[in-house]
UniProtKB/Swiss-Prot annotation:
Documented activity regulation: Alternates between an inactive form bound to GDP and an active form bound to GTP. Activated by a guanine nucleotide-exchange factor (GEF) and inactivated by a GTPase-activating protein (GAP).
Residue positions, PTM Cysteine methyl ester: 185
InterPro entries, per the entry: P-loop_NTPase (IPR027417), Small_GTP-bd (IPR005225), Small_GTPase (IPR001806), Small_GTPase_Ras-type (IPR020849)
Topology with respect to the bilayer: Lipid-anchor
Gene symbol of the encoding locus: kras1
Catalytic class of the enzyme: hydrolase
SUPFAM superfamilies according to UniProt: P-loop containing nucleoside triphosphate hydrolases
Catalysed conversion reaction: GTP + H2O = GDP + phosphate + H(+)
Region (Disordered): 167-188
Family: Belongs to the small GTPase superfamily. Ras family.
Name the record gives this protein: GTPase KRas
Coiled-coil portions: none
GO molecular function: G protein activity; GDP binding; GTP binding; GTPase activity
Prosegment residue ranges: 186-188
Length: 188
């Protein structure tokens, strides 16, 4: 069974834990209890493949930012979460993305942009803004509500699909490099 290491990042209070718990336990946690770091595992079937999701729910609070490098090193894919009613959390996405790319030492890291709390009427981040940002990053965008469960499975499953695509691409690039290295050279 394939295991996928997913990391949920974003500012404090955007609903990272609520999204994760909704996926794992099928219920909504409405009280806010800042996370330091929690790990969850769930077996699911995505596109006919049984897989194990190893999900790391991270601290959004700035005082825990030193821990970020460590979990970013081990993660294969990242859900970058902001709240649609919190413009600052949307602006913070740039910072998280840059940190992930720096730690992974790669421009090409599987990510999904997630706009959470779409059940709330007090939107300050327009859907088009988020779609444009995701497009500029070359990553998918999904709106979710941990409360109503809208888009929750889709967000995590899309990230798994992004990781699969990335692994396939890396595998093909590896094969191309091997083919190139088999060329013969004759010295006279």
């Amino acid at each position: 069974m394939t295991e996928y290491k997913l990391v949920v990042v974003g500012a404090g209070g955007v609903g990272k834990s609520a999204l994760t718990i909704q996926l794992i336990q099928n219920h909504f946690v409405d009280e806010y209890d800042p996370t330091i770091e929690d790990s969850y595992r769930k077996q699911v079937v995505i596109d006919g493949e049984t897989c194990l999701l190893d999900i790391l729910d991270t601290a959004g609070q700035e005082e825990y930012s030193a821990m970020r490098d460590q979990y970013m090193r081990t993660g294969e894919g990242f859900l970058c979460v902001f709240a649609i009613n919190n413009t600052k959390s949307f602006e913070d996405i740039h910072h998280y993305r840059e940190q992930i790319k720096r730690v992974k030492d790669s421009e090409d890291v599987p990510m999904v942009l997630v706009g959470n709390k779409c059940d709330l009427p007090t939107r300050t981040v327009d859907t088009k803004q988020a779609q444009d940002l995701a497009r500029s990053f070359g990553i998918p965008f999904i709106e979710t509500s941990a409360k109503t469960r809208q888009g929750v499975d889709d967000a995590f499953y899309t990230l798994v699909r992004e990781i699969r695509k990335h692994k396939e691409k890396m595998s093909k690039e590896g094969k191309k490099k091997k083919k190139k290295s088999k060329t013969k050279c004759i010295l006279m």
